[in-house]
Regions:
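Helix-loop-strand module that forms the ligand-binding subsite of alpha/beta enzymes
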Residues: 1-65
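Glycine-rich phosphate/pyrophosphate-binding loop and the adjoining helix
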Residues: 59-102
Length: 102
């Protein structure tokens, strides 16, 4: 299991996450143990599709690893200031998702 987290900038994942995914190509020929992939995102924007492009970008990476699947995503919108995520409904969604991972 791998859980990636990224802020959404201009409706896309951060450059740091994109670089990590691009540099992970050494995993491709290996007998990797991860199967389920999760994506946690946050943004100032609060539209339901704000993280859509980041999800599609990650799905492109996942498609290269036939044993993997996107197991879940969590989006926290309207998160601008430090601490703004406190009490956000996405936290409970993330907790429940994490608790379901065995």
């Amino acid at each position: 299991m791998i859980a990636f987290a990224t802020p959404i900038y201009y409706y896309e994942m951060s450059g740091q996450l994109k670089t990590l995914l691009d540099r992970a190509n050494a995993l491709f020929p290996s007998d990797y143990a991860f199967r389920d992939i999760y994506l946690l995102t946050s943004a100032t924007e609060d539209e339901p599709d704000t993280d859509e492009r980041a999800i599609h970008g990650l799905e492109g990476w996942i498609a290269c690893y036939e044993k993997c699947r996107l197991a879940g995503t969590v989006f926290a919108g309207s998160v601008t200031e430090p601490g703004a995520v406190a009490g956000h409904p996405a936290l409970e969604t993330a907790r429940a998702m994490g608790a379901a991972i065995a």
